[in-house]
């Protein structure tokens, strides 16, 4: 299944702008944002995506939950947050083109909140706002086949991944594959897909920009439904993605730590040996003293091994995972 849409001038311009900004992100080493920024953005993502669905917890309350502090709030809201923390911590584990993985994420996200989380619905559902039915989802007996077609589209179609991620988000909202939790799953899985385009999207709070334009978000979803065409929604989401990258670049004055730089450099070099000069060529804005300090700290932690002395020193990453790998550090932070 391929959602009908048109390639407009706006879509072309936004894709070009996003591609340009990804280049700037890579040049500034922001595809793995600093630890504190990652934590801050992850909290914003969770809070915004859940608030769209009516969750009442604030950023401060979610931060308190992450720090194992007591929070006075509805039990359901607290459970939604705890589930979302687990799901977003496992983003790298999900298989973006797998329906099974998609359902597993829903199972975790909605555990204790709905009956049979992770199960594709078999009943008919509609969305009611006030006394008005705003959307009648496809009949339950065809939902599984619609999802199969949708995942086949992800795997086989030659569309750009940026467009595919928007189409998928829209189609999840339209198909309404679960009895509840469809909105947050559409937003979550677009992030899972965007990670394939660039790792920066793992910690980019796209949901917070959607929340800021929530009325427009639902309005454009409704218009796309009525028109049977997802062009408007694709334009809307590409603009959100572009704006989120722009915000990251504007606020890039958060300093990288030595651990951040070492992790970034490891991704670039792998197991190849290197010198301090090689390290400084990657990070042109640091002094030789800072470079030496970074490398010494990594050596003292057992991350690096070295041979030679002074100017002839050669470094190499040991054949084991860094103690401060991104996933470990984020899980510790959260």
Where are the regions a protein language model picked out?
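FIC/Doc superfamily catalytic core
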Residues: 1-334
């Amino acid at each position: 299944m391929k959602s009908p849409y048109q390639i407009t001038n706006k879509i072309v311009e936004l894709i070009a702008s996003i591609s340009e900004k990804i280049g700037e992100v890579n040049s500034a080493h922001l595809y793995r944002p600093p630890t504190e920024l990652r934590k801050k953005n992850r909290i914003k993502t969770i809070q915004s995506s859940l608030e769209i669905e009516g969750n009442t917890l604030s950023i401060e309350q979610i931060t308190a939950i992450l720090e194992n502090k007591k929070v006075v709030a509805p039990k359901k809201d607290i459970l939604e947050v705890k589930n979302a923390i687990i799901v977003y911590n496992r983003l790298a584990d999900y298989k973006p083109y797998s329906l099974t993985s998609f359902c597993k994420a829903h199972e975790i996200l909605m555990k204790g909140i709905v009956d049979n989380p992770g199960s594709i619905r078999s009943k008919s559902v509609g969305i009611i706002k006030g006394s008005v039915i705003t959307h009648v989802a496809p009949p339950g007996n065809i939902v599984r086949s619609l999802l199969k077609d949708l995942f086949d589209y992800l795997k086989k179609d030659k569309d750009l991944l940026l467009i595919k991620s928007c189409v998928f988000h829209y189609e999840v909202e339209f198909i309404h594959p679960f009895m509840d939790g469809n909105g947050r799953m559409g937003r979550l899985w677009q992030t899972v897909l965007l990670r394939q385009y660039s790792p920066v999207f793992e910690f980019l709070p796209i949901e917070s920009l959607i929340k800021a334009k929530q009325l427009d978000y639902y309005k454009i979803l409704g218009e796309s439904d009525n028109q049977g065409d997802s062009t408007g929604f694709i334009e809307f989401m590409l603009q959100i993605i572009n704006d989120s990258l722009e915000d990251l670049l504007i606020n890039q004055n958060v300093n990288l730590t030595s651990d951040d730089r070492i992790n970034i450099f490891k991704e670039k070099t792998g197991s190849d040996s290197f010198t301090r000069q090689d390290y400084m060529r990657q990070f042109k804005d640091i002094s030789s003293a800072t470079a030496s300090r970074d490398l010494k700290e990594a050596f003292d932690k057992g991350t690096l091994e070295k041979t030679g002395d002074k100017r002839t020193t050669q470094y190499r990453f040991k054949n084991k995972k860094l103690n401060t790998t991104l996933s470990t550090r984020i899980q510790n932070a959260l």
